[in-house]
Design a protein with these regions (language model features):
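Membrane-embedded transmembrane alpha-helical bundles that form the catalytic cores
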Residues: 2-492
């Protein structure tokens, strides 16, 4: 009897307590998802309304585990966004409805502006006044940047007629609270997810389920076996760059470039994979971005959901490339600064955005003036790749560093203290780490057609082969992660 009481107490403690490390690859979530999924499969055969309500309830539980009491922000934003968008569409077309659109977008932005940017704004204001005021640190609701942008995209798409009609409240709530997308996206358009939510799912699409399992396996490998391992040395470098040699600093920058890709694309794979298991097909968020030969191509391959969001809801409304060459450059530059601010209220993210903005402007200028017409051979492609990857890695320094002093110290060490002796010492001290980084880059260099071939081979293999591969990966994750997978980088945004 005592054991049952203790078990029940532990169960209710789990249900009623926040977990700051809660995400798609933590073991408590995996256990919860197995129970959820078993019931979901059973419910899916009956009324769709019950299934939707069940998924929404689990999504809100997911939000509570990640955010605690701040989870109430999600249903508040959802309901207010839905009602205001419906009200906006009842307004007279023209200037009145346009004003309504502005009011709805501002209302959707208010929680994000308050929780993410109010302290930063106050700090700037008091620095200008030279006062000693220090605002209290404010907790940032996990995923707020993602579900806010998703709400805005729905409102604008309804206004523009890109999505034919406003959804029912239960469908919109499902769309905005869908738990795989909640913590770190990818930001998903209404036209992608809502039609699938509104369509009954009587039969399981086996190929989609197997694709989901493939993506989950890829996501676990990327995050738990690659990104978290590489992060160990990266953290040493960025916490105290002066304690490492110039070559060690250079390797830390290379390591973080690899880490952030495998960390974030790993989460995207997990999110898209979990959604696929449930019968929902989402768009890819990454397409081998470090294979890019210029910065424009990089942004067509990196965090595709965010880059296309800024293209459609900021760059094009600002005029895009329709108002002359100078305006095109300015629009690109402004879009990247806002992208930097989206990541966080910090001068470091602004610098990261400025660097990408400058890089995009330079590439557009060269392309518009015929300066990018160089011989198309493996040597020029290699040089283009090296310049692009190096520039992106340089920008990552400001993205990862805690402050400008850390970033400049690291860059100064790389430029002035590198030596062959330091390189040899590093190779002797961190051979396994370097091997993992180089192997990871080699994996990333795979052709998209070869990746698709591997995926199709997995999908078409027997269930026993799939089960064995999944079991081996899970065992590796358990053994190598020491039962503690680190939080995803993008959960802080």
């Amino acid at each position: 009897m005592t054991n049952i009481t203790q078990l029940m107490t532990a169960f209710f403690d789990f249900l009623s307590s926040q977990d700051k490390n809660w995400s798609l690859c933590t073991f408590p979530f995996m256990a919860s998802f197995l129970v959820f999924f078993a019931i979901y499969i059973g419910l899916n055969r009956y009324r769709q309304t019950w299934t939707k309500a069940y998924v929404i309830a689990f999504s809100l539980f997911f939000a509570f585990k990640a955010n605690g009491v701040l989870m109430w922000l999600l249903p508040i934003v959802t309901i207010s966004s839905w009602y205001l968008t419906r009200f906006m569409m009842r307004l007279k077309r023209g200037k009145v409805r346009k004003i309504g659109l502005a009011i709805v977008i501002l209302t959707e932005l208010l929680p994000l502006l308050y929780y993410k940017y109010s302290n930063f704004t106050l700090e700037i204001f008091h620095e200008l006044l030279r006062s000693n005021f220090t605002p209290e640190k404010m907790l940032l609701p996990v995923g707020i940047s993602f579900f806010t942008f998703q709400a805005i995209s729905y409102t604008v798409d309804i206004y523009k007629g890109r999505y034919p009609k406003t959804a029912e409240l239960i469908d919109y709530t499902f769309y905005l609270t869908f738990f795989p997308l909640l913590i770190a996206g990818p930001i998903t358009r209404a036209e992608v997810l809502l039609p699938q939510v509104q369509t009954p799912k009587d039969n399981v699409n086996e190929n989609l389920v197997y694709k989901g399992l493939w993506l989950i396996i890829c996501g676990l490998i990327k995050k738990a076996l690659i990104a978290d391992y590489i992060a160990q040395y990266n953290n040493i470098v960025f916490d105290a760059p002066a304690s490492q040699s110039g070559f060690g600093n250079l390797m830390g920058v290379l390591g973080f470039s690899v880490q952030i890709y495998f960390d974030f694309s790993g989460y995207s794979d997990l999110a898209i994979g979990v959604a696929a298991l449930m019968g929902y097909e989402l768009k890819d968020n990454f397409r081998f971005p470090y294979q890019s030969l210029n910065l424009t191509e990089f942004w067509h391959r990196w965090h595709i959901a965010l880059s296309t969001w800024f293209r459609d809801y900021l760059y094009i409304p600002l005029g895009g490339n329709r108002k002359g060459e100078l305006r095109t450059y300015l629009n690109s530059f402004l879009a990247m600064i806002v992208a930097g601010l989206w990541h966080g209220a910090s001068w470091m993210f602004i610098v990261w955005g400025v660097l990408h903005g400058i890089g995009l402007v330079i590439h557009k200028f060269c392309r518009n003036n015929g300066l990018d017409k160089i011989p198309d051979n493996k040597y020029t492609k290699g040089i283009s790749w090296f310049i692009t990857f190096s520039y992106v890695s340089l920008a990552w320094i400001f993205f990862r560093a805690a402050d400008m002093t850390t970033a400049t110290t690291l860059i100064d060490n790389i430029l002035h203290t590198i030596s062959l002796a330091d390189a040899y010492t590093f190779l002797m001290e961190y051979p396994l780490w370097l091997a993992v980084v180089l192997i990871s880059l080699e994996i990333h260099s795979i052709r998209e057609t070869d990746y698709n071939w591997l995926q199709s081979k997995f999908i078409n293999s027997s269930w026993l082969v799939k089960l064995c591969i999944f079991a081996v990966v899970m065992q590796l994750v358990i053994n190598l992660s020491h039962h503690s997978i680190q939080p995803f980088i993008y959960t802080q945004f």
